[in-house]
Amino acid sequence: MNKIHVTYKNLLLPITFIAATLISACDNDKDAMAEAEKNQEKYMQKIQQKEHQQSMFFYDKAEMQKAIANINAKGGANLAIIEVRFFKGGYSFIRQSVNTPAKVEVFKFNNGYWGGPSPVNLTIFGTITEEQKQEALKEALFKFDSINFSIIPERIQETIKRANASGIISVTEDSDIVVRAEIAHNGEFVYDITITAKNTARAVMTLNKDGSIAGYEIKEPFDPKKEAEKAQQLVEQSRKDIESQRKKAAGKMNEIQQTFKK
């Protein structure tokens, strides 16, 4: 009996040691994970601070004037474009290609440096020849100087204020911000500010060319289920439209046949 008891005690010691080692290892893993999370948070804060510093044109009117001057200097005199965008860290614009007037090219200023020109694929419906494309593009271009961009910092603050007052969405200066002025696919001019919250909800302020407010809305967070339902509704509506057109065509054909019978 004593021999068995002694053996049990001898076994208990290494088991206790192993358990203590495992607990210590788990604690070390937790500490390592906590340290990694802290380092990740610090890294993200540095990135955010850098983006903020490189996006002062969003918050300061004088900095916006510098950005406008920078775009004008890069684009050349009487700059005509089909799109300009301001985003966290920089801005970009798309102009008519100097060497190939039927095509367009993009210039992008990011992290303090210009990139481009880079070719952009442009589809203009109803055009076939290069001359037709060039003419259609000419009609779509608008003068960069015709848009009041200096008002952007003020309008961003107004958008943030309205968004937070709604109680539906919460945004700050550090939220994702995009300002665009462009000719949309339907040929209409669009000038707006979009601020996206962490939950992907968006506050959108639409502006006129002179910088006055044309509209404001809050768009719901992205919901895959709702988006799928919308897509299904569009498909169903398209089917109904096709069926309606088919019936009209059949009715018209029947009228023609009846006329010939007479």
Curated annotation (Swiss-Prot):
Region (Disordered): 227-262
Biased composition annotated in UniProt, kind: Basic and acidic residues: 237-246
S-diacylglycerol cysteine: lipidated positions: C26
Keywords for the protein's UniProt record, in alphabetical order: Cell membrane, Lipoprotein, Membrane, Palmitate, Signal
Covalently attached lipid (N-palmitoyl cysteine), positions: C26
Origin superkingdom: Bacteria
PROSITE patterns (alphabetical): PROKAR_LIPOPROTEIN
An annotated GO cellular component: plasma membrane
Extent of the signal sequence: 1-25
Subcellular location per the Swiss-Prot or TrEMBL entry: Cell membrane
Membrane topology value: Lipid-anchor
Name this polypeptide is given: Probable lipoprotein EnvF
Organism: Salmonella typhimurium (strain LT2 / SGSC1412 / ATCC 700720)
Gene that encodes the chain: envF
